[in-house]
Amino acid sequence: MAPMSETLVVKIGTSSLTNPHHPGLALSTIAGLVEVICQLRRQGYNVVLVSSGAVGVGCTRLGLRDRPSRIAQRQAIAAVGQGRLMRTYDDLFTTLGQPIAQVLLTRGDLAQRQRYINAYQTFQELFELGVVPIVNENDTVAVEELKFGDNDTLSALVASLVEAQWLFLLTDVDRLYTADPRQDPNAKPITIVHDLSELESIQAGGQGSRWGTGGMATKLTAAKIATQASVRTVITQGRSPENLLKILAGEAIGTWFEPQPETVNARKRWIAHGLVPTGKLLLDAGAVQAIQAGGKSLLAAGIQAIEGDFEAQDAVQLCDLNGTEIARGLVNYDSHELQQIRGCQSDQIVQILGYEGAETIVHRDNLVLS
């Protein structure tokens, strides 16, 4: 039995869902995954499935050979494919007596605090009802600047949202390697990662752009988001879904990313990962030190430069003078006001703006370290 109804998020990508030799879904892989998820449910786990494949299924249904490049066409094709994909899942899960639900999300659903809370409550109700939520990005209505961009990131944000204990990223390789094993015979497997800084040399590339900017790069980003939310993350082979059962039984399969100790509350996790920054504040060394080491709020005096056009209460990146992000937070002034008061002492703000505002630019309660 699962300890205390643990929650798992399982993400499967298009490469694992589709047949590499001919168009269409890899039904044997999907059926195997469905069977494993049903076993996990019987063991007491709550399971969320994040499934790609809507655009690919839509292309097959419409007889299109290539993935569309135009956004509007891709969104239309996703609408065609999503229904067929869900029908496949529903048929397979129904055979095993497991109810499912479709949950389509956009980044905007997580960027607004009330909608974020509503999404959390919906997932909790589905778990109470014994339902497996199947999640995908709502491609048909998502605007480019508010897209998750990939389902790896979406799955990590969902894992953080539902306070999962595990995130499984099912892919077309069996684990993470020091280079692309399909291109480099000297690539070495990586079995466990205690800190993502250990992988900086891999993330920097050097083995060809396909490996550095493709699917594995997004999985490392997802692992960072999830582990910061204390979610243990595993990359493993998608065509062997039975690996999930073996991993939960303690077998060292795939690449494990150890969770970081929980240091922030749910609201700060939302600020760190749910929001999309609309601006950037460049800070002097004193402000950087005060925020990183002292846990202080950001004052106007520490701001050297401002980038972007944003409103009060928008999310912004806080960066050192090299442009390296050190934190994120909710700003108390809009970009026009900040241009006037940057570098000033807090008691000068009312004289400059002509009205009394907040003493802090970003209060420490609305700030989270990167």
From Swiss-Prot:
GO BP term (any one): L-proline biosynthetic process
Catalytic activity: L-glutamate + ATP = L-glutamyl 5-phosphate + ADP
Subcellular location: Cytoplasm
Enzyme class name: transferase
One cellular-component annotation, GO: cytosol
UniProt cross-references to PANTHER family, sorted A to Z: GLUTAMATE 5-KINASE (PTHR43654:SF3)
NCBIfam families: proB (TIGR01027)
Protein name: Glutamate 5-kinase
Organism expressing this protein natively: Synechococcus sp. (strain ATCC 27144 / PCC 6301 / SAUG 1402/1)
Organism ancestry: Bacteria, Bacillati, Cyanobacteriota, Cyanophyceae, Synechococcales
Gene: proB
